[in-house]
Design a protein with these regions (language model features):
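Residues at the starts of beta-strands that form the adenosine-phosphate
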Residues: 5, 29-30, 110, 137, ...
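Rossmann-like NAD(P)-binding element
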Residues: 56-82, 86, 90-92
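Generic beta-sheet signal
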Residues: 34, 89-90, 114, 141, ...
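Conserved short alpha-helix immediately C-terminal to the canonical SAM/SAH-binding motif I
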Residues: 39-40, 72, 94-97
Length: 215
């Protein structure tokens, strides 16, 4: 696949990794970032994660990656309703996002909810990794109104950066990830709440692996 302009809203770990993955694989001609944090924006441009940072999505964007907190996804999608490019998010919970979009934009045609099951205990564009999605699974939970061409564009992009794509409903996704991702995080945070300094000399590899989730 070859795109003209990729717009990334939120150039942190995931957004930055999307930019690096696309650039390193020659998938796009230009990467534009929308990043409110001035330090992150400067670092991303200086280090080639994106080509430029602007204040709004350019009209000629061919694909829009929405890498913002889940509660900000729906407002962004609604704001971009008149844009022609496919839009995908990267949130780890899909049901509330889909419902919020459908309430306001009942004919949403180019929004493709996505969840790349990949990440790191690090954050920010400094942690961006062009191979972050290599071998990972990306779940697509398209709306009933999502256009097939938008869905296929997003699926092809994820496959081009090394991911395997699966499709399921938002409810199926959320039920599965509650067990495989959110519960382990909850347990790790609860466990860390019981650890004191006196325990640290008595830890080993299992402690390190388990607590990494809560880092």
């Amino acid at each position: 696949m070859k795109l003209g302009t990729l717009a990334i809203i939120g150039v942190g770990l995931i957004g930055g990794s999307i930019g690096k993955a696309a650039k390193e694989r020659g998938l796009v001609e230009r990467i534009v970032g929308i990043e409110p944090n001035a330090d992150s924006a400067l670092w991303a441009v200086t280090n080639g994660v994106v080509d430029t940072v602007v204040s709004e999505v350019p009209a000629d964007a061919d694909l829009i990656a929405l890498c913002v907190p889940s509660d900000l996804v729906a407002p962004w999608v609604i704001a971009l309703a008149d844009h022609a490019a496919p839009i995908f998010d990267v949130g780890s919970v899909k049901g509330p996002i889909v419902k919020a979009v459908e309430v306001t934009w009942s004919t949403a045609s180019h929004f493709v909810p996505c969840h790349p099951i990949s990440g790191s205990e690090r954050s920010g564009p400094q942690a961006a990794d062009g191979d972050l999605f290599d071998g990972c699974t990306v779940v697509l939970t398209p709306l009933a109104t999502t256009a097939s061409v938008a869905e296929q564009t997003c699926a092809s992009f994820w496959e081009a950066v090394g991911a395997s794509v699966v499709r399921m409903s938002p409810d199926e996704h959320d039920a599965a990830l509650a067990v495989t991702s959110h519960l382990p995080h909850l347990l790790a945070f609860a466990f860390m709440g019981q650890v004191t300094d006196q325990h640290l000399p008595l830890t080993g590899g299992g402690f390190r692996d388990f607590t990494r989730i809560a880092a």
